[in-house]
Structure formats: C-alpha cells, structure tokens
C-alpha cells in the first residue's frame, strides 16, 4: 500500500509525534464523525489502563472505546469497567475472531484498532482519523517497522515481521512495509461490501485486512502511514514460531484461494456485553 509516510511529513522522523501537538492545540469544532476504538484483550491487566488513558477525548462527535475480551483470567474486564468503557465478551478463541466480532458490534462510523499493551501511539488517533477524512480515504494501516523504538521488536520478532511482509509483497504485489501491524483506521461502511470482510480467526487476520483493503478498495483509498512503535507492557500472548508459521501458511493459502472461514461473520446474540448489563463477573 502506498504512500508510506508518517502522519505529518515523510521527511522527518520527529514529525510522527505531531499528533500530540494536534490534540493539545485543537480548539476548533470537533471532527464531524463518530469513532469506535477496539482493543482485543486477553489478560492485559498491566497495560490496559494506560492504553485507555492515552486515547485523547473530546475531539470527535462521539468516542466509543471498547474491549473485545477473550475470557481473561486476570482483572482485564474489571479494569475496563472501572474506566467506564464498553466490554464485549467473545469466548471463541482468536485475535481475528475478536476483531470479526468487534467490527460487527462497533456503534460508530470510523473504527480504530490497536493492541492493549501500550505499543501503539494512542495519542495519534485524532491525527489519523483527520487524515482519513481530509484525504477521503477508506482505510489506513500503520507501519511500525520504520519508526520502531529500541527494544520494541527484539530479535526474531523483527526478522519475522520483515520476512512476512516481504513474502506478502512478493505474493500479492502490494508495496506494504508492515503486513503484521495491528493499528488500522477505517470506515465501518467498508464491510457493507462482503468481499471486504476478513475470514481468519487468528493472527493472520492482520495481513488479510491489508490484502483485502488493497484488492477491494484500491491504492487510492487504502494507504500505509508510519507511526512510532514502543516496547510492550505485560506478558505477550503471541506464540512467536507457531503464529509466524500460521501467518506464512495463510499468505500462500490466500494467494491460491484455499483459505476458509471457520466461524460466521459478526457477534453472536448470546455474547455478553456491558451495555446490555449481562456481563458475568471476572473469572
């Protein structure tokens, strides 16, 4: 996907942080959109509160922050409720499954995604949404590799991300730097076209989203922007070798049309949600 640049100026690394200044000095009318930020969670009690606190408030017509929780056994859901954000429980396993549910139940026009581990620059959410609107885009994915901070992607993780992104470029011919990024900004309406709905319930959903965005939306509507990436807070749920191998296999399966959908699109009516008042106590 192209162009690849930071939110302000592709010639300056420091300008990636101008989103903070944008929020601080933003005194005009609110952006005329409603926004849902989706955080998939499983045992993120250490990082969830600072992740939520880092998301700016008051810059759009309505901001919904929601976790889609995969049966956390720590205080993740309790912390979310203390922070007065929406909690949607999804007991079907998988990173992709959490997002395929969250995309369906999100209430607002624009969706922003990121991990609940303090790695992504939550302070840039308003800047990225404004970029989506100003440039009449449908989808933004955020490249972590160009501006990754020291210690944020050590050893095999950095090599694995590079190898998977290189493979995706070769197989699909799309100029994307970071096929595994989990920070995206897009219009919920893209899913009105069923061809844009991802099928994978696991980690490969991340690369699938970018493949579909370029294929369905086109290079003028789907772009990649570089953002800072920071060391995570808390223990990672990802399994480096196992998830890497699944991502690699999925790229080839997608390329030849052998991928398959294991679960239906969207949430189940039985999924507990804090807005419905039927969320069970934390396990």
Task: Please provide the spans of the model-predicted regions.
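Hydrophobic helical membrane-anchoring modules
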Residues: 1-32, 173-174, 197-283
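Short, well-formed alpha-helical segments that are part of the catalytic scaffolds
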Residues: 18-26, 43-57
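Cell-envelope/extracellular polymer assembly enzymes that use nucleotide-activated donors
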Residues: 34-36, 64, 208
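Donor nucleotide-sugar binding loop of glycosyltransferases
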Residues: 44-47, 72, 95, 121
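A conserved acidic beta->alpha catalytic loop
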Residues: 69-77
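Acceptor/aglycone-binding surface of glycosyltransferases and processive sugar-polymer synthases
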Residues: 91-105, 122-203, 231-242, 248
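Short aromatic/hydrophobic "clamp" motif used to bind/position activated sugar donors
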Residues: 111
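The conserved acidic donor/metal-binding loop of glycosyltransferases
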Residues: 115-120
